[in-house]
Amino acid sequence: MQSSNQLQDMLHSINRKSYPAYKSLKGAYQFNKYVLSIDHVQGDPFASPSHISVKIFHREAGFPAEYYKDKLTRITLADYLTRQFEQQVNRYTFRAKGSGKSGLISVTRCGQEVLERTACEITEQGIIARFFVGFPANGRTINAGELEKIFFEFLPVCVEKAFVYRNLSGKDLENTIFLAEDQAYIREELKKRSLVAFVNDGAILPRESGISSKPMKGSVTFSRRKVFG
């Protein structure tokens, strides 16, 4: 594994070269609190963006062990962190300039569902986040200075704010974990009682449209008294 300083040196050495020289960056680099991996480099600035991942060890992230003690909590924590990371990278996407997809920073977009995704994975060693970056260029000439901004200015802030426990709302995360555990309990009870669904009082069932999972504005909330008398 190489250091972040070596990555900077490599960026300086390929600046203004033709775009394929970016492929020499593929590999893993040790930053202060995480490992940055350049897993796949796009062929040109107009192609699908490059694949990047970061690994933050648990000792750096600082999340309580009970938040990733089993599959349910790991999926819930990973989903929560993906949403936090998406919020952060959205502040910086396309702030680095260039042609085509230059400066793009994107994460898999989450819907309302809490699902297991490749965008974030909780392992025994730490947290792995996977995302996409458009490597900057002017035409098809490398603009390494703009990529340096992404890797050394934007990304460290995003990682610090999204994946370090002390920088997040502990209460919000705790409530998210509790909600997931409550949902898992209800699902098990449905099976035991041979039921197909549980609808809570006050639930909004109609959706905004056939392609939206958002609740319809102004709709009547569910009441079991109105249904069953």
Where are these regions (language model features)?
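N-terminal accessory targeting/assembly segments
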Residues: 1-215
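Glycine-rich phosphate/diphosphate-binding loop of Rossmann-like nucleotide-binding domains
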Residues: 210-212, 218-226
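Glycine-rich phosphate-binding P-loop
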Residues: 229
